[in-house]
Amino acid sequence: MKKLFLNYFPFIIFFVSCQFNNYETVDKNIRFREKIQTGNFIKLSKGHTYYEIDNQKSLKTLVFIHGFSVPSYIWDDTYYSASEKGYKVLRLDLYGRGYSSNLDIDYTDNLLADQVIELLEELNIKQATLLGLSNGGRVISKIAYLKPELVEKLIYVSASSFQDHNPTENKSVSGKEINNFIKNNYPTISKGQLLDFKYPENFKGWDNKYENLLQYEGFARALISTRKNHVNLDTENSFINGSEIPFYTIWGDSDSAVVYNEFKDKLNKLMPRRKEYFVSESGHLPNMENKEEFENLLFNQILKEN
């Protein structure tokens, strides 16, 4: 029995080694970008940005900002519905996510906000309604603070913009941290995406799409750096509340990723002017899990308000 185990032991090591060697093997360089058959790429000041745009002659523009790790495809349902309704629609992959460049710099809120601002300027979009999902809520808060004239409305969906954060002193990301993150998280991180749903059984295959992201070199570093650079956005959110920008918060009624009750008192103090809505039978992604109710709220109420 011992001899049999020893015979299999090298195979086990080889299998595990191959499994981890499949992670972060793809460099998102020019050859990579040339193979992408959808959307567009544009070179901005910090790197290449992947984006999709439709109905460019429409006067009403919606810009969809994704969350912490899942890129712009997380907005598929709402993006295509808005496009069919005639809105000018724009979505992009933030740096470190999807098809956009993975950078070797700090992933701050300013970096991601500046990316969106630069893209809007390059596309000659003077004003837009910004929709920020989860961590994307942080990005739209920062945009509104830096360039309020760009913003027609702000729509926060399951936004992680309002919690308290303890500043991280050392914001650098070491190779050891990256390797440990890949080793400890990558084997299960895709399956973990299903926890965003109240009824994950209705979204079979959702985790498989995420698996593709794990092959891009620099993804783990982007996630670690983003988390390390999270700071309180009280100043930005207070500014928005005191501005004339209309803003709205939308929550899934069963969100276990961003737990509303943990920060609602702070939110009430920071942004009492907001209009707030809860989508039934949905977790962290109400735009997907209860598409009908979410889109009725978005298109027939929020976007029709003057």
Positions of PLM-derived features:
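Flexible "cap/lid" loop of the alpha/beta hydrolase fold
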Residues: 142-145, 154-184
